[in-house]
């Protein structure tokens, strides 16, 4: 159910874009993201930090898009979010000395420290590359291509990278954890 809720604003954005335009889609994205956040609070009595940050960025960049009637703001939101993700991963590794990936998954998985570090860096690089790809596609290609990339391309890339990360993790699990 939670995964469905995470994708709901994206589905709403895409549907409103196809039915109306980027501004209606942006308005719908803000509303859908707020509804998911409220539902999460009512249902689970907690809101994940990343969900809250995402909502704030959606509201700010989406609000600017609607107010100025300029789609560049909503296009930048994607890169800003990926930049924040990459920054958090890199800071956790180099400043806090414990990779964020390890903090998130360390209770469920036992991996050698170098594996956590490589996985953390791989995700940081992934987010940086996705952010750069977003900039190129958002500002050099037609809007409809950017919307398709945002909805389908980035989702597919994230799924593929998650699967590859799973394979990498599996290869480094202790024998007793593999069964």
Curated annotation (Swiss-Prot):
Q: What is its main location?
A: membrane
Where in or outside the cell it occurs: the entry states: Cell inner membrane
What does the entry list under GO cellular component?
plasma membrane
* The organism's place on the tree of life at top rank: Bacteria
Keyword Membrane assigned to the entry: answer is yes
**Database matches in NCBIfam families:** ispZ, PRK00259.1-2, PRK00259.1-3, PRK00259.1-4
Q: What does this protein do?
A: Plays a role in cell envelope biogenesis, maintenance of cell envelope integrity and membrane homeostasis.
Name the record gives this protein? Inner membrane-spanning protein YciB
Q: Whose protein is this, by species?
A: Citrobacter koseri (strain ATCC BAA-895 / CDC 4225-83 / SGSC4696)
Its taxonomic path starts at:
Bacteria, Pseudomonadati, Pseudomonadota, Gammaproteobacteria, Enterobacterales
